[in-house]
A protein has these predicted regions:
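Acidic, proline/glycine-rich low-complexity IDRs
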Residues: 1-41, 86-168
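Amphipathic, interaction-prone secondary-structure segments
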Residues: 35-85
Length: 168
């Protein structure tokens, strides 16, 4: 499978693991955590890592990240496009990073770039753990969900299914 790294509408295809490592570091550093004066999130609020089969038109597995390097936290969201053979079990859900010991403040990690929505603080993990998740996803080259952290089902907009205020 081919690794794609997308940010700000630009998709790159690292040719080696060294290139991927450099792009991962650049992506984490370049993510913009803030809001614009209009209340919208600027470009670069997320980075998408995905895998695509040669000759395919759509990626088959995704890892989206939001991070704030200044405060040292980020969020990972993983899902597949449910094309066979990835059907059933974990493949039927979107998964959000879960931190059993979340920060005692809201790190305001962007969950939806079109609205002022943020991830739940319990989804925020320290940046070294986030980087390990990204590296695991990219190194395996299968698109499988990384196993180095805990996950909870949720939505692309950051809503967690384990919260009482989750609305289907």
């Amino acid at each position: 499978m081919i690794l794609e790294i997308s940010m700000e509408g630009i998709t790159k295809y690292p040719a080696s693991w060294h290139e991927a490592e450099v792009m991962i570091a650049e992506a984490i550093a370049a993510i913009s955590p803030g809001e614009s004066s209009a209340g919208r999130h600027p470009k670069g609020s997320h980075v998408w890592f995905s895998f695509i089969e040669p000759g395919a038109t759509h990626s088959c597995a995704y890892l989206s990240i939001a991070a704030n390097e200044a405060i040292g936290f980020g969020v990972a969201t993983w899902w597949t496009n449910n094309l066979p053979p990835r059907v059933g079990g974990i493949y039927d859900y979107m998964w959000i990073s879960d931190n059993p010991t979340p920060p005692d403040f809201d790190p305001r990690l962007v969950s939806d770039t079109h609205y002022p929505l943020y991830h739940d603080p319990a989804s925020a993990i320290p940046l070294p753990r986030l980087r390990a998740v990204i590296e695991e996803f990219c190194r395996c080259r299968t698109g499988e969900r990384p196993e180095s952290i805990s996950w909870v089902t949720g939505e692309l907009n950051g809503q967690r299914h384990d919260r009482p205020d989750f609305d289907v």
